[in-house]
Regions:
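General small-molecule cofactor/ligand-binding pocket signal
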Residues: 89, 155, 228-230
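A short beta-strand micro-motif
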Residues: 198-204
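Short glycine-centered, acidic/aromatic-flanked micro-motifs in structured strand/loop junctions
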Residues: 35, 42, 117-119, 204
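Basic/polar, cationic surfaces and motifs that engage anionic cell-wall
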Residues: 2-13, 19-25, 29, 110-113, ...
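Short glycine-rich, low-complexity/disordered patches
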Residues: 195-197, 226-232
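N-terminal catalytic cores of peptidoglycan-degrading enzymes
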Residues: 1-108
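A short, charged, amphipathic alpha-helix used as a generic interaction element across diverse proteins
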Residues: 209-227
Length: 232
């Protein structure tokens, strides 16, 4: 049995949890990745699990009845400074996460699993990589557990808005761009189970006669090389 990626900290006081609306048939249809938009990477800000996350004296986490938002999961730092993922709702319960767009809402039909990543000040590359790696691992696990989720439907809030099924937000693309990444990079990360693919540029030269030039070019093109030739 695979080890759990998340710890459970259900937001039982949140009205979304209390409503308990089940996802429709064919859902979860995808996953939306959000980021919080505030410089606070600590899970205790959003998750009521003091034994894991630490105490939040303000109690302004998602586990309260006076808030109209609740994602399925939150990724951030626990009380020991480790990147962890908290599960706030059952995966097959509709969350209140992305709002609505011109065509409807991915909160409901079709329903998407939605995960918040706690932002820091967007300058710590080590935290960025660790947080998105764990989120990618979680997405890969969810795809395995729910075959209705396809890779092209793992999207950001910004992408959900562009499709017409979410409110006008820019997360988490702005954070990805800080480190030269985008959602295509994240989807590839999910595809590879959270491991970033390292690519190498291979170049070389080979001298051939005019008679063999066409054959040599064809062989290199078949291997995926960009081919150029010059007279020596």
């Amino acid at each position: 049995m695979s080890e759990p990626i998340t710890f459970t900290a259900y937001a039982v006081k949140n009205l979304c949890y209390i409503a308990g609306r089940k996802m429709p048939a064919g859902s979860p249809a995808g996953i939306i990745i959000h980021s919080t938009g505030a410089s606070n990477p600590n899970l205790r800000r959003y998750v009521n699990a003091p034994e894991i996350c630490g105490e939040n004296p303000y109690k302004n986490y998602f586990d309260r009845p006076d808030i109209d938002i609740c994602p399925h999961g939150v990724v951030g730092l626990d009380k020991d400074g480790a990147v962890r993922a908290a599960k706030l709702l059952p995966w097959t319960m509709c969350c209140w996460g992305c709002g609505s767009g011109a065509k409807g809402s991915y909160n409901y039909s079709p329903a998407y699993i939605q995960i918040e990543i706690c932002e820091d000040d967007l300058t710590d590359e080590a935290y960025f990589k660790a947080a998105f790696k764990l989120t990618a691992q979680l997405c890969a696990r969810l795809m395995k557990n729910y075959p209705t989720i396809k890779l092209n439907n793992i999207i950001s809030h910004k992408e959900a808005c562009a499709r017409g099924y979410a409110s006008n937000h820019g997360d988490c693309d702005h954070w990805l761009a800080k480190f030269g990444k985008n959602m295509d990079w994240f989807r590839e990360l999910v595809k590879n189970g959270g491991e970033e693919v390292v690519r190498y540029k291979v170049t070389g030269t080979k001298t051939v006669t005019r008679a063999d030039l066409g054959k040599a070019q064809a062989q290199l093109i078949a291997l995926g090389f960009d081919v150029d030739a010059e007279v020596l």
